[in-house]
Amino acid sequence: MARKTPIERYRNIGISAHIDAGKTTTTERILFYTGVNHKIGEVHDGAATMDWMEQEQERGITITSAATTTFWKGMAMQFPEHRFNIIDTPGHVDFTIEVERSMRVLDGAVMVYCAVGGVQPQSETVWRQANKYKVPRIAFVNKMDRQGANFFRAVEQVKTRLRGNPVPIVVPIGAEDGFSGVVDLLKMKAIIWDEASQGMKFEYGDIPADLVSVAEEWREKMVEAAAEVSDEMMDKYLGGETLTEEEIIAGLRERTLKCEIQPMLCGSAFKNKGVQRMLDAVIELLPSPTEVPAIKGETDGVEAERHASDDEPFSALAFKLMNDPYVGQLTFFRVYSGVVKSGDTVLNSVKGKKERIGRIVQMHANDRKEIEEVRAGDIAAAIGLKEVTTGETLCAVDAEIILERMEFPDPVIHVAVEPKTKADQEKMGVALNRLAKEDPSFRVRTDEESGQTIISGMGELHLEILVDRMKREFGVEANVGAPQVAYRETITKTVTDVEGKHVKQSGGKGQYGHAVITLEPSGEGKGYQFFDEIKGGVIPREFIPSVDKGIQNTLGNGILAGFPVVDVTVRLTFGSYHDVDSSQIAFELAGSLAFKEAMRRAGPCILEPMMAVEVETPEEYMGDVMGDLNRRRGMVQGMDDDGLGGKKIKAEVPLAEMFGYSTDLRSATQGRATYSMEFKHYSEAPKHVAEAVMAAKK
């Protein structure tokens, strides 16, 4: 089956924004203009197509990145048909993992900002993730029809807050109630959309007289940004020659692909204005799969790569798992190279297992179409893969490659869940395992002491939604305990020559293991490291991994309060063995004993997770908000005007003090302040806190 759309006309894009910037509405309009949706779904009716989980429609926030395929020929049908694979990503900080994993499989992104709120905290997180994966992006400033809308302020904030390099390619005509269209700076014409056709039709007109000088000023900046692409373009521009529209677009495109500039557009998705021009910009300025660097991976430990071509061996990345009530597990994957057909056997190179792809479906939000095959650049979902988890590679059986893995953060909050009835008990195990498979930032374990099931995640909302899904999708009723903080233990000083000896010799085959270690702090975030510094064979080679294993088995249970031990370096320096009685288990026990003793002597302490908290509040509540953060042991690190007459406060606060903060903040500011928080790092807990934590564990 030949390709319908050449790969050069593919655009794999993400639509990414802060909560309430109107991202889902923007995506809905895209689906409407590209002819997929006949009736526009409004978020505030709870009817948006991309938000298809029940909870999303109730809460009006997007939780899972739905992937949708659609086509666009341009506002004036001026392009050959292009194929857009759109991933709608959540804007809530508890779901940052979803943003991260969609950034990994995209080629370009549209950042949606609110013309009133501008660049908000979550926008910064998303921007950092886009930088990490070097994703070229354009920005769309939405809600131009709202009170207080200001396009140029948003442009300025992209520069100052995100350290981006924004280049507007349109400017708005009017704002708030008077917003009526945009001036296209490439054509130097006004674009006015027809309201009766919900913006399906438009006409070009002259630029309003009062906007001519503004439009000329911004056009000049845009042309200069395009000319900076090369010395010859710059010479032409400085020599006073006029650059053609094609040359300007080519210059802007090349610089956008290199992530040197971010073209900016504006509009009001709700009022059906501006989204159409933004779709044209996706074609003009964002890359096709062949214009981004070849995907890197490794084969047998050697670096390898795959180019976006149907002729290369098949390779794909599974970036999301979803459970579907009718067909079971859907595995969303992005094809980087080659072709795969339904019924083919592929290799999961991470696990070294072969699997058969049953059926392949392409999603339109929650609607699916079965297709025969997918090719390089496609995004689709497979039915029938059993073993695959998020972030793993699927590839041709005879051309093995492991694509770069995604990094998933460790959870910072735990709660205990208990099934309400015996019947719920078994179902809960199945449900939790399935949810954990879908979402790598969600973990499930059983507490050895209490026998309780503990679930961990990225925030209160994250866990709340998962418990909710357990009830809706799996029919499991559960009682949820109070949230617990994920404390850690570490050491503060170095100790040397600490020995652990495990000896049992009372006739017959005995046990003998003897290890001497140095224990030192390895620095924040460095994790556990083990170095073998044995000289002269005082411990035989085959027993050294056993010492390491014994220590690793002990790491999960610190000596102060049983929390996991992090950021320690162990050097195995000396020891002894017995020809007959030494065994692997004896050296595991020796390693464990040495480590426990060394921990006791090395100034053990408790670490607590610190959160980066950002509060936006009207000025009159600033004193109350700051006082409250101080009471929560927060350290205020800076204050800013938020550009709307309010203040933006940045602070670092221990997670333990942040439970229930949203309720307290709402009542202290009559619901007018908002906040976001994300995990920053672990830091040593003050003495009184550590003592309280240890007392609670006894």
Curated annotation (Swiss-Prot):
SMART domains (alphabetical): EFG_C (SM00838), EFG_IV (SM00889)
Record's keyword terms, sorted: Cytoplasm, Elongation factor, GTP-binding, Nucleotide-binding, Protein biosynthesis
Entries under PROSITE patterns matching the protein: G_TR_1 (PS00301), G_TR_2 (PS51722)
UniProt binding sites for GTP: 17-24, 88-92, 142-145
Keyword Cytoplasm: yes
SUPFAM superfamilies: EF-G C-terminal domain-like, P-loop containing nucleoside triphosphate hydrolases, Ribosomal protein S5 domain 2-like, Translation proteins
Any single GO BP term: ribosome disassembly
Keyword RNA-binding belongs to the record: no
GO MF annotation, one: guanosine tetraphosphate binding
Domain of life: Bacteria
tr-type G domain boundaries: 8-290
Cell location: Cytoplasm
Role, per record: Catalyzes the GTP-dependent ribosomal translocation step during translation elongation. During this step, the ribosome changes from the pre-translocational (PRE) to the post-translocational (POST) state as the newly formed A-site-bound peptidyl-tRNA and P-site-bound deacylated tRNA move to the P and E sites, respectively. Catalyzes the coordinated movement of the two tRNA molecules, the mRNA and conformational changes in the ribosome.
Sequence similarity: Belongs to the TRAFAC class translation factor GTPase superfamily. Classic translation factor GTPase family. EF-G/EF-2 subfamily.
Protein's name according to its UniProt entry: Elongation factor G
Organism: Chromobacterium violaceum (strain ATCC 12472 / DSM 30191 / JCM 1249 / CCUG 213 / NBRC 12614 / NCIMB 9131 / NCTC 9757 / MK)
Organismal lineage: Bacteria, Pseudomonadati, Pseudomonadota, Betaproteobacteria, Neisseriales
Gene (UniProt): fusA
